[in-house]
Swiss-Prot record:
GO BP term (any one): translation
Protein origin, superkingdom: Bacteria
GO cellular component entries: cytoplasm; ribonucleoprotein complex; ribosome
UniProt entry tagged with the keyword DNA-binding: no
Description of how the protein assembles with itself and partners: Part of the 50S ribosomal subunit. Contacts protein L20.
Stored Pfam families: Ribosomal_L21p
Family affiliation: Belongs to the bacterial ribosomal protein bL21 family.
Encoding gene, per UniProt annotation: rplU
Protein name per UniProt: Large ribosomal subunit protein bL21
Length: 105
């Protein structure tokens, strides 16, 4: 069984036991649980339910894993004929979630 969830404005396809990488979660410490109630669709084994936009009474419980940073992205700004250039680096924080259960199915 799988579910399509929306979390922080992005959509993810999850199954029980799978892990996903989302933008940083600073509200919950690693090892804690979160419940995602924005479930767009569930399906599998002859069962398909589609919400409009979300399903009522269905949720996904996930365990918060490690927080880590992505590889560095280098942004280079340049203006011709003005002797202006600037290099900026950025590393985004991410959190790994492990889906423990799909609730309300």
């Amino acid at each position: 069984m799988y579910a399509l969830i929306e979390y922080k404005g992005k959509q993810y396809k999850v199954e029980r036991g799978s892990s996903i990488v989302v933008d940083n979660i600073s509200e919950v410490a690693p090892g804690g649980c979160i419940d995602v109630r924005e479930v767009l669709m569930i399906g599998g084994e002859g069962l398909t339910r589609i919400g409009s936009p979300y399903l009522e009474g269905v949720g996904v419980r996930a365990v918060v894993g490690e927080c880590f940073r992505s590889r560095k992205i280098t942004v280079y700004k340049y203006k011709s004929k003005k002797d202006y250039h600037r290099t900026i680096g950025h590393r985004q924080w991410y959190t790994r979630l492990t889906v423990s259960d799909i609730l309300g199915v």
